[in-house]
Amino acid sequence: MQPLHGNCLIAYARHKYILTMVNGEYRYFNGGDLVFADASQIRVDKCVENFVFVSRDTLSLFLPMLKEEALNLHAHKKVSSLLVHHCTRDIPVFQEVAQLSQNKNLRYAEMLRKRALIFALLSVFLEDTQFIPLLLNVLQPNMRT
């Protein structure tokens, strides 16, 4: 397993699933858990169909859609490197966006569809008070304390 040096990832556990952190810690998830994580803190195995990789550029496009006062909420504090949201229903578009995120040669329409689907997945975490600080830490790692 290789550590991911990059931006962030969204993982979806259809069944029980284990993620390995860079520090060797194991995190266990149940079926229906949607995870947003700092990709540099996760070791990803070859089973990447459960992951959507989100680039810094895509995250930067997501931020302007948020209210300015939301961005000022404790952006400097230390936060967990991952967040979990339990979904009560299956996420039918997850496999499509996972496939699109692995493809490097997307047509323009596919790129726009991928971005829109990633924004929809990111919006699931908006009610979590730790989401925006984690998002800002991913974008500006020098702010970590």
Task: Locate the predicted segments by residue.
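Generic detector of well-ordered alpha-helical segments enriched in charged/polar residues
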Residues: 60-67, 94-98, 132-136, 144
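Residue-identity detector for glutamine
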Residues: 2, 41, 95, 99-102, ...
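Short, Lys/Arg-enriched, Trp-marked, Pro/Gly-tolerant hinge/linker segments that flank
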Residues: 78-86, 104-114, 122-145
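Residue-level signal for functionally critical sites in structured catalytic/ligand-binding pockets
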Residues: 8-10, 17-18, 109-120
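Hydrophobic transmembrane alpha-helix bundles
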Residues: 38-39, 45-46, 62-66, 111-125, ...
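N-terminal regulatory/effector-sensing and dimerization cores
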Residues: 1-79
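A structural motif
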Residues: 85-96
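Hydrophobic alpha-helical core bundles mediating ligand binding, dimerization, or RNAP-core interactions
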Residues: 54-55, 94-101, 114, 118-125
